[in-house]
Amino acid sequence: MAGQTAVQGANPGNKAAVPPVVEGPSREERLVAWARANQKYLAIGLGVVALVVLTTWFLSVSAKRKANFARTQLEQAWSAADAGNLPLASGEFQKVASTYSGTEAAYEAALSLNQGRLLSGQSQLAVDDLRKFIGSNPPARYATRAGMLLGAALENLAKGAEAGQAYEQAAAAAEADFAKAEALLASARAYRSAGKQDQAVAALRTVLEKYKETASYPVAEIRLAELTKGS
């Protein structure tokens, strides 16, 4: 009976109490807490980033200074060459090429040095140095010029077949059509001097097939007609 009385006395309209919702920390608060807990690692990370930025800036400034110094030395060497002082110019070109390796001025100096050697009859020395230069994988425009100089040096040594190959390599390295065509004309000439008529004809036909818009095209037509007797 007591149990029934308790049940009957209960108010069926009363609802169970809902516990209050307790909100957790906000995203910003969690971020602040994480930063405080990891401030040591954050400081290290920021230090690394700052070091990378500073190193990059320093290397950029150093590279620019190196390039400027190299250009100044190169211009002085050119001035000596223009004045007819080839021994002084040669020494300065060598200095720029070795001291400022990798700069535009160093590439120019290496080519100017070997051009001077051709003019002074040092073709074999030029051949040896130019082959090393080309083997160092310089930018295409310098590889092309070096190949042309190498071909000329080999022609001076009466090595027409090797010269033809050097000119072909220069053509392959060239980026502009006119430069490719000029190198192929030189290749045909060198091959012809060595009695390699088939290679000479092939070089000329490449000009006629691929580089019709260049100034070398009519020259190639004439030389091919001479070699093939119009056939």
Role assignments for model-derived ranges:
Residues 2-48:
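N-terminal positive-inside, membrane-proximal cytosolic segments immediately preceding the first
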Residues 65, 97-106, 134-143, 171-179, ...:
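Short solvent-exposed coil/turn linkers within tandem alpha-helical repeat scaffolds
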Residues 86-87, 123, 160, 197:
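TPR-repeat structural position
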